[in-house]
Swiss-Prot record:
Entry coiled-coil feature ranges: none
Organism (species): Stenotrophomonas maltophilia (strain K279a)
GO molecular function: oxidoreductase activity
UniProt cofactor(s): FMN
Protein name, per record: Putative NADH dehydrogenase/NAD(P)H nitroreductase Smlt0482
Family to which the UniProt record says this protein belongs: Belongs to the nitroreductase family. HadB/RutE subfamily.
Length: 196
């Protein structure tokens, strides 16, 4: 890296960015979602496994499929959000490693039962989901990540017959400041970190 980002960029990505609970009635074009993914894909994962799989739920029909899986507290805001990204992970991610990591037989590291790949898929897929939040902010979108849903119902509705499992959801769009809660505190360096 040649230089640090300026303060305005750091604010947009971290310091002044907020988890959004309400969004303006402003559509997010499919071209912007493609641009978003084209940033996310460059984020690092172990052995370039890139196990995350994304479904961008935008249509009324797809939202209706998602609705029964949502917790009560997440239902209304998700139905109103322009986009809900389902962040999934593919338990058969290793099948693409001959292409993604060709300089050694990385696929062999993960051969065997799917259960043995779950940890790597979840860990690296979660990284990619975090990259999605930051990439969305970098592109001028707001994000509202959520865990309150029934993964089995999401998997049945969107990933049936595949090796993909849902991890978490992220509402995307242009945030409505009226829906923000007061800013919550964060732990200080001394509370959360140490230098060994």
């Amino acid at each position: 890296m040649s230089h640090a980002l300026d303060a305005a960029a750091l604010d947009q990505l971290f310091r002044t960015a907020r988890t959004q609970n309400a969004f303006l009635d402003k559509p997010v074009p499919a071209s912007l979602l493609q641009e978003l993914y084209d940033l996310v894909k460059w984020g690092p994962t172990a052995a370039n496994t890139t196990p995350a799989r994304f479904v961008f739920v935008t249509s009324k029909e797809a939202k209706a499929k998602l609705a029964p899986a949502l917790s009560e507290g997440n239902h209304d805001k998700t139905m109103a959000a322009p986009v809900t990204a389902i962040i999934g992970f593919d338990l058969d991610f290793h099948e693409k490693l001959p292409y993604l990591f060709p300089h050694t037989d990385a696929k062999a590291w993960f051969d065997g039962p799917q259960e043995g790949r779950h940890e790597a898929a979840l860990r690296n897929g979660s990284l990619q989901g975090a990259y999605l939040i930051l990439a969305a902010r970098a592109l001028g979108l707001d994000a509202g990540p959520m865990s309150g849903f029934d993964p089995a119902k999401v998997d049945e509705a969107f990933f049936a017959g595949t090796s993909i499992k849902s991890n978490f959801l992220v509402n995307l769009g242009y945030g409505d400041p009226a829906g923000l809660f007061p800013r919550l505190p964060r732990l200080s360096f001394d509370e959360a970190a140490r230098i060994a």
